[in-house]
Amino acid sequence: MRSSVLSLHPDRLLPADPGTRAIAGRLYAQIATLPIISPHGHTDPAWFATNAPFADATELLLVPDHYVFRMLYSQGIDLDAIGIPRADGMRAAVDPRAAWRVFAAHYTVLRGTPSALWLNHVFHDVFDLRLRLDAGTADHYYDHITAALQTPDFLPRALFERFNIEVIATTESPLDPLHHHAAIAASGWQGRVVTAYRPDPVVDPEHAQFAGALQQFGALTGEDVLTWNGYLRAHRQRRAFFAAHGATSTDHGHPSAATADLSPAQAQRLFDTVVRGAATPEQAELFRAQVLTEMAAMSLDDGLVMQLHPGCFRNHNRPLFERYGRDKGADIPMRTDYVHALKPLLDRYGNDPRLRLIVFTLDETSYSRELAPLAGHYPSLLLGPAWWFHDAPEGMWRFREQTLASAGFYNTVGFNDDTRAFLSIPARHDVARRVDSAFLAKLVAEHRLEEDEATEVAIDLAYRMPKRAYNL
């Protein structure tokens, strides 16, 4: 069967109504080529430190992308067949080309999803491919992409510059020595790659490696991390180290948004239980909650912006987790409370202008009921953009519709891509810019905004807001 042409319509994601589409097109034209601010994500700093070529199409575009392989798995594709590493680091003996052929043969499963939008953008604009990916073009794609990746124009730093990225933030464990960030800074390359402090490994008592991570935390800092005060001093020390390597933010991926405000004596007693390995699930939750409030206190001193990404049931598929480990597409959104959960922290620090807490959600029902009213009141609180399962065009639109009335635009932080998939970053930002242009055009067409106001908001959302919110 003959493959069809791959094309990107210039008006994709803009309104169907001609008049509104014309307004959206004018707005989009003002922001389409603005530099990319990527204030939160999971790209590998080693890429930019070593500037080594990416290996092949499969290793770059398929293996790291859980958005893609979770959909393949849902259709009965064994993860071994596409080369996904197992929990022990080993892989099935599958040729990368064979894995790519499996992906191409099932590419139709992504139709209509944001992954298809992003990947088609990558194929068309980054690799200049003009036939759609399918079983018949699988080898053509694999050979073309893999060959391109060995050329100077496709080295990580060249792509960073080609993508017009002004700054990108990676996310590291408190145990990370940040050697790659130091190497980037010492290299003389002008690309700006900063880190972010993600203390989850030494904050979650229910993590299988918590005890070992805590021991490493103490060895790394020289603090007695088996005492509450020593544990807090270790965090302060590592936060300062991260800030010295460019960090402007912290990130916290907790099961819930719970916070607490315990007395020092209560916190010490709880910590004693935690380090003995005797914490109940309720005590583990209380410990995570107290640490969040302690992180807020530290932010008052060191200025690091807090990000909270709660409400995900991690590793829902137990047999898959046991075989392949974490981050294999089996994370599921949960109902999440914010009004009661955040109150202890907000009672303590929510009115202090030195604190900036950016809250995300996987529970869309909380947008208008809880999060927008909270962000529309507390000076310390901002709303992160539609996240993970909701960063599709429809999810971005729902986010704007449900938060605008109570939070406005200026209690949000613009867009962040939150991705491991480096080559998709321009596509993700382009989708967000198109959706925001369409949303603003509707307000102009309804005479709720003047076009010059909408233009200013569009520029703010695409560029100024993330820089300001993340102190970049």
Swiss-Prot record:
Give the domain of life: Bacteria
Pathway listed for it is: Carbohydrate metabolism; pentose and glucuronate interconversion
Q: Which reaction does it catalyse?
A: D-glucuronate = D-fructuronate; aldehydo-D-galacturonate = keto-D-tagaturonate
Instruction: Spell out where the chain crosses the membrane.
Output: none
Disulphide-bridged cysteine pairs: none
Single GO term (MF): glucuronate isomerase activity
UniProtKB keywords: Isomerase
Q: What is its EC number?
A: 5.3.1.12
**What are its GO biological-process terms?**
D-galacturonate catabolic process; D-glucuronate catabolic process
Which Gene3D superfamilies does this one have? Metal-dependent hydrolases, uronate isomerase, domain 2, chain A
The similarity comment for this entry is:
Belongs to the metallo-dependent hydrolases superfamily. Uronate isomerase family.
Q: Do you know which HAMAP family this protein is assigned to?
A: UxaC
Matches recorded under NCBIfam families: PRK02925.1 (NF002794)
* PANTHER family in UniProt: URONATE ISOMERASE (PTHR30068:SF4)
This chain belongs to the protein called Uronate isomerase
Which species is listed as the source? Xanthomonas oryzae pv. oryzae (strain KACC10331 / KXO85)
